[in-house]
Amino acid sequence: MEQYKQEFIEFMVESNVLTFGDFITKSGRRTPFFINTGNYKTGNQLNKLAKFYAKAIYDNFGDDFDILFGPAYKGIPLSVSVAMALDNIYGINAAYCSNRKEVKDHGDKGILLGAKLEEGDRVIIVEDVTTAGTSVYETMPILKSQAEVDVKGIIISVDRMERGKGDKSALTELKEKFGFKTCSIVTMEEVVEYLYKKNINGKVIIDDKMKDRINEYYKEYGVK
């Protein structure tokens, strides 16, 4: 596993973004782990997060893109900070673009923030975590309504590796539906592998009991 992936996993734990216990998801699933990206709150955290995204984007796409698109609302600060990180680390001067939930009728009018989309622009969608892919299904019509852009793919922080609407993961369903590349900084499989019996700040994050619970969860909800 790449060094930056290991560092990202520890970063999520230390930021209290990734926690283990007993939780209920929005869809009603009882899960032994929870990912709350709302706990990235400080400038330091966002700076580090953006660097992890930048490294994963470069690993998966190189410099084959022009614009980072961040779906509102969480994708807005992501697209901005990751664009800055790409410039700082790799010298890639990508633009950022996001959508508004409400269209403005004054000043900077329209549905988009940031760069104007033009025909042929190569776009990467930057998301936090996708379970059902809902925001992407909402994003694609917005992109196509603005210009005939070339969506190269989507990058998320963690692939939960759970079934979407059918027996496949949400990312796999998006790939099959739209034909673009789907990738993540890490997968939950990598997370569990790295954190099993791993001591962070004096605490073992995933012990045998938690590992068994995670395995049972994926027997029921994991991708086949």
From Swiss-Prot:
Keywords: Glycosyltransferase, Magnesium, Pyrimidine biosynthesis, Transferase
Residues the record lists as binding orotate: T131, R160
Catalytic reactions on record: orotidine 5'-phosphate + diphosphate = orotate + 5-phospho-alpha-D-ribose 1-diphosphate
Keyword field contains Cell wall biogenesis/degradation: no
Intrachain disulfide bonds: none
CDD domains reported in the protein's UniProt record: PRTases_typeI
EC number: 2.4.2.10
Pathway(s) of this molecule: Pyrimidine metabolism; UMP biosynthesis via de novo pathway; UMP from orotate: step 1/2
Keyword Ribosomal protein attached: no
Gene3D superfamilies assigned: 3.40.50.2020
Any one Gene Ontology BP term: 'de novo' UMP biosynthetic process
Source organism superkingdom: Bacteria
One GO cellular component, as annotated: cytoplasm
Gene Ontology MF terms in the entry: magnesium ion binding; orotate phosphoribosyltransferase activity
Subunit details: Homodimer.
Identification of the protein by name: Orotate phosphoribosyltransferase
Gene label: pyrE
